[in-house]
Regions:
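Flexible, acidic/histidine-containing loops and adjacent segments that form or flank the divalent-metal
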Residues: 1-85, 152-158, 162-227
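Cap/insert and terminal regions of metallo-dependent hydrolase folds
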Residues: 52, 57-61, 82-184
Length: 227
């Protein structure tokens, strides 16, 4: 946790690197384990577009993954982690491997915008967040199935989405969000800000206006105690 260090020691902040390019921290000291196949063993007709059944790491699995802590507060930033192709190669389930070493957090950014083959139940259980923030940039973020996975796996979780589309979704691609699912989305349509205070003891989450550029605070959650 010294590779990305604060400029000042005024605050008890650490950034623990969890994974990059398939090199995953073991949870002990600076020890890591290599999970991707050796270069000589990689087989793919077109590596940049490797399919799930090819022995080649997809770009998203190479994400830089980290756990950011401030006092008792922990935040998960899993980049574009996914589990595509895990039935063909166990090492492709890098999302779960990272979640297991990263452990519990207060808030997590949903892996890979909440698209298909991400945010699996076992990874969600490992993190057990009180809040999940989804950074969306198309109408199908997060996928309805993934949103449902989040709220059924974690009965007490609140979901916050930067842009939440509740209308019809492309036929054959995704289902319309149900009223029950929509009710679990607390903050949406704006910048999602997590403000941690009192040396990491407490935090609030808020939405800021993001259309006119005023950054006006639209809504703020109650104060939560960090675990």
């Amino acid at each position: 946790n010294t590779q990305i260090a604060p400029k000042s020691d005024k605050y008890d902040v650490t950034v623990q690197n969890i994974s990059v390019n398939g090199e995953i921290w073991t949870g002990v000291g600076t020890n890591t384990r290599h999970t991707f196949p050796e270069l000589k063993d990689i087989v793919a007709a077109n590596p940049p577009e490797a399919s799930n059944d090819e022995n080649c790491p997809p770009e998203n699995a190479c994400s830089c993954v980290m756990k950011i802590s401030f006092g008792n507060f922990d935040y998960w930033a899993g980049g574009d982690l996914q589990y595509n192709g895990k039935s063909s190669f166990s090492w492709k389930n890098i999302e779960l491997a990272c979640a297991q070493v990263g452990g519990k957090v207060d808030v997590m950014k949903a892996n890979h915008h909440g698209v298909t083959n991400t945010n699996q139940a076992e990874a969600l259980k490992a993190h057990d967040p009180r809040h999940i923030v989804v950074c969306s940039w198309v109408d199908c973020h997060p996928r309805t199935k993934v949103l449902n996975e989040m709220i059924t796996t974690l009965p007490n979780v609140d979901v916050h989405i930067t842009n939440f589309w509740q209308g019809e979704r492309p036929s054959g691609v995704d289902d319309k969000v149900t009223a029950e699912e929509a009710a679990r989305v607390k903050l949406y349509d704006g910048h999602i800000v997590v403000r941690v205070t009192d040396g990491g003891r407490f935090y609030r989450i808020m939405t800021l206006e993001d259309v006119q550029g005023t950054m006006k605070v639209k809504k703020v959650t109650t104060k939560y105690t960090s675990r």
